[in-house]
């Protein structure tokens, strides 16, 4: 949902092809979907948010000479050299930062048991990779737009909605359907 929010804030007319493989290990189906997204809908970048299955989407990008966005960690650093070469950036789930935050809070005598805590961009809970391929291949205009988008979230101009409630999930489905090719 954050991806759609960010992309449509930068380009209100953008089209986003969203597909679900239904699990985290089906690389074959993810590759099939990736190839279809590129060949049928002219997707020029794919974010494979599906655990190991996303690697199939990366393989589709490699075969079609398109960019891939990694997920959870810096996949450019963990992929084989051929897949790393087409990984433009990665959406980061900074689990290490959340663990440090939790133990710092615990050491300070704060107890959050039973409380929902959201560690977003401002707290370092999530982020994106802006060095390596991104730094090398992104235009200055793209880098500026990415920084503007980050700043808009940090200063509250853009609120990243959640899908963790029924209302939020319904909003995600509606928004996803609005931007389909």
Model-predicted segments: where are they?
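A residue-level marker of the well-folded mature domains of exported/periplasmic proteins
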Residues: 1-181
């Amino acid at each position: 949902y954050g991806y759609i929010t960010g992309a449509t804030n930068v380009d209100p007319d953008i089209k986003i092809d969203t597909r679900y493989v239904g699990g985290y290990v089906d690389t074959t189906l993810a590759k099939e979907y990736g190839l279809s997204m590129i060949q049928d809908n002219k997707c020029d970048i794919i974010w494979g948010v599906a655990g190991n299955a996303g690697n199939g989407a990366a393989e589709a990008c490699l075969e079609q000479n398109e960019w891939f966005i990694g997920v959870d960690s810096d996949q450019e650093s963990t992929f084989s050299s051929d897949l790393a070469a087409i990984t433009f950036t990665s959406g980061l789930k900074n689990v290490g930062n959340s663990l440090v935050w939790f133990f710092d809070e615990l050491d300070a005598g704060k107890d959050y048991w039973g409380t929902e805590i959201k560690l977003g961009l401002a707290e370092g809970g999530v982020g994106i990779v802006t060095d390596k391929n991104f730094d090398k291949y992104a235009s200055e205009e793209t880098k500026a737009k990415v920084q503007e988008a980050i700043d808009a979230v940090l200063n509250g101009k853009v609120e990243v909605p959640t899908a963790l409630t029924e209302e939020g999930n319904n909003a995600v489905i509606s928004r996803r359907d609005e931007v389909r090719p």
